[in-house]
């Protein structure tokens, strides 16, 4: 479902804006420091309940203001208008509205607004620790498997309880009750993740063939413990070691997605421009699977589109984004950098000092 309207109040350097959006490409053009990234950040906040640039609410609320508001309107497949909104206050209080109803959860907001972000710091997906790739996998599973969110939340609570018990337990018997449910849920989560990676691997490789034809890129999934060992057996076997360490060593919270070229991690082979295309391929494959599995379209947020990409690679990425028929928001310093993508269906917005005007 594309956003048809976006209203931003007191976010970063934006006092207020109210813009009508294209269901296709939307370009936000402006010099560095103008606020163009803030527009994408506001949309991300609307879908995730948090910023991708700061974890501190006080830093994203405009100076001398006590709260921020971001509102959006969707056009549903039935052509109804669905309003959504988020309000954040300096004390950390957050209120979410969906369809005019207050008290909604952030997970519900994320479900109705599936967003994919590609930004200059996005290399962390392939270059940094496993937590970024787990988040990547779990974003996808969350959107296609309705039971995932509750199951994963329960696993995290059970693991926390288990870690607390490890500090006082004298025998494994004291943990066996908790471990039974933990093992069952962990195996279920693992299977959902396996199925998901199997679904997106082929799409990722196909997109990589277009973006990076000189490389044969392979994805492999590590579940967080030995593939041949049932998790219940591992928990019992590792009790003494876990007790000594004070936490549970293996489990679904240690899962990883390994991305390699001829057996070598991609970050040791690809240039920065190629790594950006690798990240784009992963995000686009997720969006493709989301549409195939649910009928929903991703919304793509691409901050600093031209960064790390030469004109040929920019053109490749733009062509693929157009093929998705998804709604896309792109920030750029100059209109020349995105001239080839602009058409009659797209909209261009110029921003300077936090003030937005349609170009």
UniProtKB/Swiss-Prot annotation:
Q: Where in the cell is it found?
A: Cytoplasm
Q: What exactly does this protein do? A: The RecF protein is involved in DNA metabolism; it is required for DNA replication and normal SOS inducibility. RecF binds preferentially to single-stranded, linear DNA. It also seems to bind ATP.
Organism, as annotated: Aliivibrio fischeri (strain ATCC 700601 / ES114)
Q: Which Pfam families match?
A: SMC_N (PF02463)
Decide whether keyword Glycoprotein is in the record.
Answer: no
Keywords (alphabetical) are:
ATP-binding, Cytoplasm, DNA damage, DNA repair, DNA replication, DNA-binding, Nucleotide-binding, SOS response
| One of the record's GO molecular function terms | single-stranded DNA binding
Q: Where are the transmembrane segments?
A: none
Is Signal one of the keywords? no
**Gene that this polypeptide is encoded by:** recF
Where it mainly occurs, coarsely classed, is cytoplasm
| Gene Ontology process terms (BP) | DNA replication; DNA synthesis involved in DNA repair; double-strand break repair; SOS response
* Protein name per UniProt: DNA replication and repair protein RecF
The family database entries (InterPro entries) matched by this protein are listed as: DNA-binding_RecF (IPR001238), DNA-binding_RecF_CS (IPR018078), P-loop_NTPase (IPR027417), RecF/RecN/SMC_N (IPR003395), RecF_2 (IPR042174)
Binding positions for ATP per the UniProt entry: 30-37
Please give an example of a GO cellular component term from this record.
cytoplasm
Q: Which family does it belong to?
A: Belongs to the RecF family.
Q: Which NCBIfam families match?
A: recf
């Amino acid at each position: 479902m594309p956003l048809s309207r976006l209203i931003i109040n007191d976010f970063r350097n934006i006092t207020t804006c109210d813009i009508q959006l294209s269901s296709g490409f939307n370009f936000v053009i402006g010099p560095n420091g103008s606020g163009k990234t803030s527009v994408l950040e506001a949309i991300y906040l609307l879908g995730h309940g948090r910023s991708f640039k700061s974890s501190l609410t006080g830093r994203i609320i405009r100076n001398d203001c006590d709260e921020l508001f971001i509102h959006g309107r969707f056009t549903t497949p039935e052509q109804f208008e669905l309003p959504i909104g988020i309000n954040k206050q300096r004390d950390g209080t957050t209120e979410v509205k969906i369809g005019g109803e207050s008290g909604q959860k952030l997970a519900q907001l994320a479900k109705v607004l599936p967003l994919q972000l590609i930004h200059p710091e996005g290399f962390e997906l392939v270059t940094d620790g496993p937590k970024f790739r787990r988040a990547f996998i779990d974003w996808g599973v969350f959107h296609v498997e309705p039971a995932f969110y509750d199951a994963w939340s329960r696993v995290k609570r059970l693991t926390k309880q288990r870690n607390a018990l490890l500090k006082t337990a004298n025998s494994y018997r004291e943990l066996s009750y908790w471990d039974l449910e933990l093992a069952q849920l962990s195996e279920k989560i693992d299977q959902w993740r396996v199925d998901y990676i199997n679904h997106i691997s082929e799409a990722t490789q196909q997109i990589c063939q277009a973006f990076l034809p000189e490389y044969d890129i392979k994805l492999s999934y590590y579940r967080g413990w030995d593939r041949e060992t049932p998790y219940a057996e591992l928990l019992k076997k590792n009790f003494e070691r876990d007790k000594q360490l004070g936490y549970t060593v293996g489990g679904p919270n240690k899962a990883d997605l390994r991305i390699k070229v001829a057996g070598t991690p991609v970050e040791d082979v690809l240039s920065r421009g190629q790594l950006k295309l690798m990240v784009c391929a992963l995000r686009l494959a997720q969006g493709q699977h989301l549409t195939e599995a649910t009928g929903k379209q991703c919304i793509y947020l691409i901050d600093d589109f031209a960064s790390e990409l030469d004109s040929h690679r920019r053109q490749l990425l733009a062509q693929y984004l157009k093929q998705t028929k998804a709604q896309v928001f792109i920030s750029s310093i100059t209109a020349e950098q995105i001239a080839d993508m602009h058409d009659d269906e797209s909209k261009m917005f110029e921003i300077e000092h936090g003030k937005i005007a349609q170009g």
